[in-house]
């Protein structure tokens, strides 16, 4: 499951509001981020990871 301060807003009440602003949040990181992503940067995705 998601954990830590980065994922906390999405898990709390109003979390869907955070998800709806995904593109706005990505834009805050600056230019060139699409080169570093492993999935489409314009689509919000989530899943359980096993690292």
Curated annotation (Swiss-Prot):
Induction or repression: By E.ampelina infection.
Keyword annotations of the record: ATP-binding, Cytoplasm, Ligase, Nitrogen fixation, Nucleotide-binding
Reaction(s) the record says it catalyses: L-glutamate + NH4(+) + ATP = L-glutamine + ADP + phosphate + H(+)
GO molecular function, one term: ATP binding
Enzyme class: ligase
Annotated EC: 6.3.1.2
Localization annotation: Cytoplasm
Primary location recorded for the protein, binned into one broad class: cytoplasm
Protein name as annotated: Glutamine synthetase
Organism from which the protein derives: Vitis sp.
Lineage: Eukaryota, Viridiplantae, Streptophyta, Embryophyta, Tracheophyta
